[in-house]
């Protein structure tokens, strides 16, 4: 996971091809202007999924993992918490190749949030649990963007 202030994202240029594409896009575009839905940035190599969910308690969620895509997530309205699994994993739902995800539970984690213009980049294969209730807020609406960035290993397919 890479976690920091969205305004500092340029520091991560050169790490991942898809991240470089997104950094270039962010220099020219305001993500808050995107409507709910899917928006291509560079075909299926980089795109934005804009969602308007309600945050949920951890007890109602599982960790998700992806094989082909990294997820870079931001909140443009509201705020959410997230967790990243650090312990042993228990499979909850088999991998769905079409939608590139499986669900797992874990016995240990670290936590963060996407308040105050922060971002989190969850790398492919990293179990993460987004869209959790921000501490003390309860369930709240949030407008968020999950930028899907194709992992370098699949870039030339």
Where are the language model's segments positioned?
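A short hydrophobic beta-strand segment most commonly corresponding to one strand
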Residues: 119-121, 138-155
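Short, conserved beta-strand element in jelly-roll/cupin
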Residues: 67-80, 86-88, 94-104, 148
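A short glycine-rich, His/Asp/Glu-containing loop-to-beta-strand
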Residues: 36-57, 68-76, 84
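Short beta-strand segments in beta-sandwich/barrel cores
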Residues: 79-83, 127, 153-154
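A short beta-loop-beta micro-motif enriched in histidine and acidic residues
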Residues: 42-43, 59-71, 88-93, 107, ...
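Conserved metal-binding segment of the jelly-roll/cupin
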Residues: 113-133
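His/acidic/aromatic-lined binding-pocket segments of jelly-roll/cupin-type domains
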Residues: 70-74, 111-112, 119-120
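A short, N-terminal "cap"/entry segment at the start of jelly-roll beta-barrel domains
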Residues: 1-50, 60-62
């Amino acid at each position: 996971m890479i976690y920091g202030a969205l305004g500092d994202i340029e520091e991560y240029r050169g790490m991942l091809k898809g991240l470089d594409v997104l950094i270039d896009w962010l220099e020219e575009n305001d993500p808050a202007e995107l409507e709910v839905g899917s928006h291509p940035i560079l075909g299926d190599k980089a795109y934005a999924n804009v969602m308007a969910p309600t945050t949920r308690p951890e007890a109602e969620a599982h960790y998700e993992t992806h094989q082909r895509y990294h997820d870079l997530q931001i909140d443009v309205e509201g705020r959410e918490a997230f967790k990243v699994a650090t312990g042993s994993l228990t499979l909850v739902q088999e991998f769905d190749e079409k939608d590139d995800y499986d669900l797992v539970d874990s016995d240990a984690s670290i936590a963060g949030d996407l308040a105050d213009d922060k971002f989190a980049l969850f790398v492919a294969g990293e179990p993460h649990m987004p869209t959790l209730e921000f501490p003390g807020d309860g369930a709240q609406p949030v407008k968020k963007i999950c930028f899907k960035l194709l992992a370098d290993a699949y870039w030339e397919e």
